[in-house]
């Protein structure tokens, strides 16, 4: 049996024979046993990404006041170049990308953890759009898989959605479309 420990299976004991079964994700192996052992969840880097937003510094400082290790990446030409720079600045398996022209939702805690048995995904959180009174993925905080961003050579019109993604049904921020 392959044994997992922790709420999101972030500690795994894998038998040697499992290698021949796993193609895409650990769930390919037919004998997975989830244990309820408490395991400390890793934290992921938080990176505020901006370009020339007038309130970039203010929004960054608001996040940094609550999350002291948050980093700022700004002034990079082109979205993909900016995402790749965020990935280079990160030292964790995943990193949170917060768009500087949005305000963090009160109570959003950056504590989501991917299921470690699944293949890597980017995780898109909902963003509230006050212009239409609706929350959806556009401009939401994204939990990027660092290596997937660094390794990207080809992508479609939307960089993030060119790779495996999951939408997380949680409002992370409010967009400011007026900047």
Residue ranges and their predicted role:
Residues 77-79, 101-104:
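Short active-site-proximal "capping" loops at secondary-structure junctions
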Residues 16, 49-51, 98-101, 126-128:
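Short loop/turn segments at strand-loop or loop-helix junctions that form parts
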Residues 95:
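Short aromatic/hydrophobic "clamp" motif used to bind/position activated sugar donors
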